[in-house]
Structure formats: structure tokens, C-alpha cells
A protein has these predicted regions:
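Conserved catalytic core of the tyrosine transesterase superfamily
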Residues: 1-317
Length: 317
């Protein structure tokens, strides 16, 4: 990797090549290890990768959050484990320094009424360019009804969307996996409507992307996120400053909606988690549990099921 310049450049490059060969995602480690390489150069560091160097790098920017610093440290620590195999002078770094907090920001589970308000705001975007509002409506609706990640939405190509069978092909997503995602009938109908308007508006467009802007190019994920935040603000769901509901919260809504549906139908929710994990593109179904936020509706349904269980004469031990 030509941009690496520290004394660790060669093993860093070999380490990242190994991760890629093993099928591991490398975007975040590459980013942090490039920064580590630059930091080591800045300090004119020579000698082994020490605990002090790794910790100083992790804490080098006082503006970073505690969790972000912890992540930087852990990435370097894993590299040090690799380095120790070839360089016995490399110490094993303490895994308990800068522990990553397990606390997560509570997610916002959009109600149907809140989603409708966002859709209304989307349709009012750019009155002189109605395709723009329809496009954002379609992208947001697809994420809400199918649980797609924001990168998966903007990454869809026309060939990935089968408007006849209602099937999406999600290619090489977050964990390097591809999967098929069946669409709800109402979502399919809306995507057909969008595709018809798009093709009529841009009949000579050669762009492969399914969702395009007026420049006849694919939307960037940052653009979709930024516009969505603005729509949520105008819909009264966010304040002018600070954190509020995000596009990714649509994915949480989808998972919770699935859970509520299964509870109401009397289906074994635990037994369905592997299927939901596959649908959402998780490697392990335990990752899916993060999305199953305890909403008031879920708690009420769980309490009702538990009461029915007691009424049937089961014994609690």
C-alpha cells in the first residue's frame, strides 16, 4: 500500500491483504490503520509497537468520543497481535484499556403516522421537479418495508430489481454477502410507478442505478441521509440541533413490525429470528436481536402471551 510511510508500512499492508483474502471487511480497519501509520510517522516512532504508542494514537484527538477512541485502540491492538507472530518484541496490548461501551443510543421506532408525515414532506420536495420527491418517497418506503440498509438502497441497479416477480438482489452488502429480498405487493406497485415515471422523464438515461437524480446518476448515501434528516425535521420529528430519528431507524422499525406481526399470529418469535436475520443480511441471528427494541406494543403483546400461558395452568418455577 503506497500511502503507508511508517516503519510499520510493510506489515500493515500485509495484514490488510490477509484480512481481505479471508473475506473480512476492511474499510474501517484500513481507515484507522492509515491514521495510525501517519501518527507513527508524525512521532518519528522507531522500535516495537508499544502499549503507549497505541494508547496515545487512540486518544490523539480530544474531540473523538470515548467509543470512537476505543475502536481506534482495538483496531491497532488486533494488528499488534498479528505483528507479534513475526516480531517477538511486539507486546500483546491490554484488551481492557479503553473498553468499548455496550450502551447504545435508543432507536426511534417510527409509527405509521410519522412515516406518512415524512412521505408527505418527500412529495413536496422540488415542486418543479416532481421526480425528485417521488424518488425519495420510493427510497424511504423501500427501506421501511424491507429493512434495507441505506447503502443497499442507493446501491441497487436496475438489474437487481425484478419488477415482474417482486424480488430484489442485494449484492455484496455489509458483510460481503448477497441475498434475495422479496417485496411486499404495495412496495412493488410503488416501485413500478416510480420506474415508469423515471423512464418517461429520462428516456435516454444510461445509468445502471435504479434510483437516480436529475443529473441521471446514482444518489450518494450521504445525500439520502441528509435529505431524510431534513424531511424528518419538517415532519416535526427532529429539532434544529442534536440527534434525532435517522434513516437507519427505518431498519429497526421493520424488525419490530415483524416481531409484532409474529406475536399477534401466535408464532414462535425465537424460532423465527434466524429467518429474519437472513432477510436482513446478518451473519449471525444474534446480531438481529439488537433491532428488537422493546416498544410499548411489544411489551403489551408479550404480557398478554405470558398471561395466557399462566391461564392455561402452567407452573412457574
Amino acid at each position: 500500500m503506497k500511502s503507508l510511510r511508517s516503519m510499520f508500512a510493510e506489515p500493515l499492508s500485509a495484514y490488510l491483504d490477509l484480512r481481505r483474502a479471508l473475506g473480512c471487511r476492511c474499510e474501517e480497519p484500513t481507515f484507522h490503520l492509515r491514521s495510525f501509520d501517519a501518527y507513527a510517522c508524525q512521532r518519528n516512532h522507531t522500535g516495537p509497537l508499544t502499549q503507549e504508542l497505541a494508547l496515545a494514537f487512540a486518544l490523539s484527538n480530544p474531540k473523538n468520543s470515548t467509543n470512537y477512541c476505543a475502536r481506534r485502540y482495538q483496531v491497532v491492538r488486533h494488528f499488534a497481535e498479528y505483528l507479534a507472530i513475526y516480531d517477538p518484541t511486539t507486546p500483546l496490548l491490554d484488551p481492557k484499556i479503553l473498553p468499548h461501551s455496550q450502551a447504545r443510543t435508543p432507536r426511534h421506532i417510527y409509527t405509521d403516522e410519522e412515516l406518512l408525515r415524512i412521505f408527505d414532506e418527500a412529495r413536496s420536495l422540488s415542486p418543479k421537479n416532481p421526480v425528485r420527491g417521488l424518488t425519495f418517497h420510493a427510497m424511504i418506503g423501500l427501506a421501511a418495508s424491507s429493512g434495507l440498509r441505506i447503502g443497499e438502497v442507493v446501491g441497487l441497479d436496475r438489474g437487481d430489481v425484478d419488477l415482474k416477480t417482486g424480488m430484489l438482489l442485494i449484492r455484496q452488502s455489509k458483510f460481503g454477502k448477497s441475498r434475495l429480498v422479496p417485496l411486499h405487493s404495495t412496495t412493488l406497485d410503488f416501485l413500478r410507478k416510480y420506474a415508469a415515471v423515471r423512464d418517461a422523464s429520462f428516456p435516454d438515461c444510461k445509468e445502471a442505478a435504479f434510483f437516480i437524480h436529475s443529473g441521471q446518476r446514482r444518489y450518494a448515501r450521504n445525500t439520502l441521509q441528509r435529505v431524510f434528516v431534513g424531511l424528518a425535521f419538517r415532519a416535526g420529528l427532529r429539532g434544529p440541533k442534536g440527534r434525532g430519528p435517522t434513516f437507519h431507524d427505518l431498519r429497526h422499525r421493520f424488525a419490530v413490525k415483524c416481531l409484532v406481526t409474529w406475536y399477534k399470529a401466535g408464532i414462535d418469535v425465537q424460532g423465527m429470528l434466524p429467518a429474519l436475520a437472513t432477510y436482513m443480511g446478518h451473519v449471525h441471528y444474534t446480531d438481529t436481536a439488537y433491532y428488537l427494541t422493546a416498544t410499548a406494543e411489544l411489551l403489551a403483546l408479550a404480557a398478554e402471551r405470558y398471561q395466557n400461558w399462566l391461564d392455561q395452568g402452567e407452573v412457574v418455577s
